[in-house]
């Protein structure tokens, strides 16, 4: 969206993405990286989740599945003819300012340097390494301890007792996916909450 808006305003903008596909975390991945779960659906309506100048197609349900959101983003880039200005599969390792040239320097993985007048950094969601909280005594726990970033398949937890720590969207999605698969699902969180069935 930033790329599209900048180009509409007359900037000669280029978009970079380290992924080799459009859609970021909305594309499900088996890799231990941040992505949606296979069964993720949007928790707001498509009318609120869409960009103002590009509604979701009529045949998409009110709360689209992750794959439908990912396709929506692909369709968005095609509709606004953004692909020629996108460099997918390109990692920016560092951004510095060259005082002599008065340009921003992008150090691209592989050793290339490119110079730009302006830089907009637009990253969404958690894109780095998972950060597990320090839990006293966790080293004594004999079971597995994984971050939601690594949770991909509910069937891996079949007939197990699972504790989901937290009450964020990811925690709620994880717990929901485990119901009916795991033997027991518990949620631990700091604040009171009501769960409505």
What residue ranges belong to the model's regions?
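Core beta-strand elements of the Rossmann-like FAD/NAD(P) dinucleotide-binding domain
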Residues: 108-118, 158
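Short glycine-/acidic-enriched loop or helix-start segments at secondary-structure transitions
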Residues: 2, 25, 130-132, 174-175, ...
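Generic structural signal for residues in well-ordered beta-strands
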Residues: 13, 86-88
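N-terminal Rossmann-like FAD-binding beta1-loop-alpha1 element of flavoenzymes
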Residues: 1-15, 171-178
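A conserved short coil-to-beta-strand element within the FAD-binding core of flavoproteins
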Residues: 88-103
């Amino acid at each position: 969206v930033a790329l599209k808006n900048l180009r509409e305003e007359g900037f000669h903008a280029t978009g970079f993405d380290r992924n080799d596909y459009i859609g970021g975390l909305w594309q499900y991945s088996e890799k231990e990286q941040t992505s949606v779960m296979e069964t993720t659906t949007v928790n707001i309506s498509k009318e609120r989740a869409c960009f103002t100048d590009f509604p979701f197609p009529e045949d998409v349900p009110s709360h689209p599945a992750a794959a439908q959101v990912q396709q929506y983003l692909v369709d968005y880039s095609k509709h606004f003819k953004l692909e020629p200005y996108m460099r997918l599969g390109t990692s920016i390792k560092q951004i510095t300012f060259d005082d002599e040239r008065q340009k921003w320097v992008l150090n691209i993985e592989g050793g290339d340097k490119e110079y730009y007048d302006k830089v907009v950094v637009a990253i969404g969601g958690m894109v780095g390494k998972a950060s597990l909280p320090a839990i006293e005594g966790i080293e004594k726990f004999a079971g597995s301890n994984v971050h939601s970033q690594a949770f991909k398949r509910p069937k891996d937890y079949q007939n197990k007792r699972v504790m989901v720590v937290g009450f964020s969207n990811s925690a709620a999605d994880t717990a929901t996916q485990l119901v009916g698969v795991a033997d027991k699902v518990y949620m631990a969180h700091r604040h009171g909450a009501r769960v409505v069935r």
